[in-house]
Regions:
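Alpha-helical transmembrane segments and their helix-helix packing motifs
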Residues: 2-279
Length: 279
């Protein structure tokens, strides 16, 4: 009688333990990137997230939709940024919080991780500022009867008129969603898998108004430039769109993002799937 071998189809996505292992490997790669390459990839990520932010503010300039629908669809527009980061390849500070998995498994050192974080944070900011320059020179803010410019000021002003602690906790919530989106994207085996997996977590954090430090590297300078050009004069809090206001927001959002991504997501999943049992 002939022997029949039963072949089972490969799973459509990685299991959580395999995602953690892949995340550790990615952390090692990130930690060993030459500074110039890491910085350039970080600039790409800052630019990509800025593209998502631009798409978001252009959409928000149309006030015909109700508040809830506008936030949800605007969040879907913003997804463009992380889709470009994951599919095209770039170094995003918030996603790099997951390097803690590699750190805890002693595959990289604390110095390597912190160095990578600093290089990527600065690179993200430079990339975002470059897009602010391009958007200004291209006159995108003049669209929809200059309503886009007012939308840019409104979004930015809303981020500098809340207290530091609130921004910090919104930053924690934000990077929980972002790192889970990256986690899902890592699980996917095709471009479609990655894109679909990203949509809901990213749309949710944007719709809820959480604080993403890299997105704010675009939103805040863009709003400040528009306010300096005379737009959004009647927007509450617009006068706080200056260097101090930007630093105030980014300090809280950055620290909150680190706690949300590195401590709550990365450390949690490392403990579950990679921590060695003690005899």
């Amino acid at each position: 009688m002939a022997d029949f071998k039963v072949e089972y189809p490969a799973p459509y996505c990685l299991a959580p333990a395999a995602i953690e292992a892949k995340t550790e490997a990615a952390g090692v790669t990130k930690a060993n990137l030459p500074v110039a390459k890491a910085f350039l990839l970080a600039m790409f990520a800052g630019a990509f997230i800025a593209f998502g932010g631009l798409f978001f503010t252009v959409f928000l300039s149309d006030s015909t939709l109700g508040w809830g629908a506008q936030r949800v669809v605007g969040g879907l527009c913003f997804c463009l940024g992380l889709v470009l980061v994951l599919v095209c390849g770039a170094e995003l500070f918030t996603g790099n919080s997951l390097m803690v998995c590699a750190l805890k498994s002693k595959k990289i050192t604390l110095v390597q991780m912190l160095k990578a974080w600093v290089v990527v944070w600065v690179g993200n900011f430079v990339g975002a500022l470059f897009i602010v320059f391009l958007v200004y020179m291209a006159g995108i803010y003049k669209l929809n009867g200059e309503a886009v410019a007012n939308s840019m000021v409104s979004v930015a002003a809303g981020k500098v008129t809340i207290d530091w602690v609130t921004i910090f906790f919104r930053g924690i919530l934000c990077n929980i969603f972002v790192c889970l989106a990256v986690w899902i994207g890592t699980a996917g085996k095709t471009v479609v898998d990655k894109v679909v997996g990203i949509l809901l977590p990213i749309a949710a954090f944007v719709a809820c108004g959480f604080e993403h430090c890299v997105a704010n590297m675009y939103f805040l300078p863009m709003g400040a430039v528009m306010h300096a050009c005379g737009y959004g004069a009647k927007v509450a809090g617009a006068d706080a769109l200056n260097a101090a206001g930007i630093a105030f927001n980014l300090s809280a959002a950055t620290l909150g993002n680190i706690v949300g991504g590195a401590v709550l997501v990365a450390l949690g999943y490392w403990f579950i799937y990679a921590k060695k049992s003690e005899a």
